[in-house]
UniProtKB/Swiss-Prot annotation:
Class of enzymatic activity (EC top level): transferase
Compartment list: Cytoplasm
Gene behind the chain: cmk
Protein name: Cytidylate kinase
Keywords: ATP-binding, Cytoplasm, Kinase, Nucleotide-binding, Transferase
Signal peptide annotation: none
Gene3D superfamilies hit by this protein: P-loop containing nucleotide triphosphate hydrolases
Length: 222
């Protein structure tokens, strides 16, 4: 079974998906980590961190590197790179590289292969997960929150010197990019269960999703 969790950046997708995985015994995958690894590959190649590589160059570089999810960690050429992809430098470019159709096709293919090859239960989170990657998911959730709340959450997670105002502006830019992508844009699927997480704690959101999951499970098992 697949529980697909969609929504904008910092809406709580990763934290809630991880907590749900623990409570339900499902494996957790974040599509965003794949895009962040691809952005890391680009930044390691580029002499200037602000340069944006072409789609053809990105696809060439990705083909020369090995990106894997082993069930627990995200690996680049056999090395766990989680500590290298959760920072402002990656934040700055990840939405731009993830807008490339070729890049999205690679990530979507990897996600589908993981689910297909391993007969297991998954919670998969990311933008366009409910609309493009797993439109057939048994449970589809869309998490949302105001920009101010999302910026504050991101601010509390960070250890660098970025300001709250800078994070709010960055999220607004990212929302605009994600909502206007040619392919895989952020949007509400008509079958999703919408949850505004702005003023809900993690446990409350998890309880809502588990209730939805249990109702769906009963329907499937009839």
């Amino acid at each position: 079974m697949v529980i697909a969790i969609d929504g904008p950046s910092a809406s709580g997708k990763s934290s809630i998906a991880k907590a749900l995985g623990m409570r339900l015994g499902f494996k957790f995958i974040s599509s965003g980590y794949f895009y962040r690894i691809i952005t890391l590959i680009a930044q390691r190649f580029s002499l200037n961190e602000y340069d944006l590589l072409s789609e053809s160059k990105i696809l060439e570089l990705v083909s020369q590197n090995d990106i894997k999810f082993n069930g627990f960690d995200f690996l680049l050429n056999g090395t766990n790179v989680i500590s290298h992809i959760l920072n402002e430098r990656i934040d700055f470019q990840v939405s731009l590289y993830s807008s490339y159709i070729g890049v999205r096709n690679i990530v979507n293919k990897k996600l589908r292969e993981i689910v297909k090859l391993k007969d297991d239960n998954y919670i998969i989170e990311g933008r366009d997960i409910t609309t493009v990657v797993f439109p057939e998911a048994e449970v589809k959730i869309y998490l949302d929150a105001s920009v101010k709340v999302r910026a504050l959450r991101r601010y509390n997670q960070r250890s660098d010197n970025v300001t709250l105002n800078e994070l709010e502006q960055a999220l607004e830019r990212r929302d605009e990019i994600d909502q206007n992508k040619e392919y895989g844009k952020l949007k509400l699927d008509k079958e999703v269960f919408y949850i505004d997480t702005s003023y809900k704690c993690l446990d409350d959101v998890c309880n809502i999703i588990i209730k939805t999951f249990n109702l769906k499970k009963k329907v499937i098992e009839r």
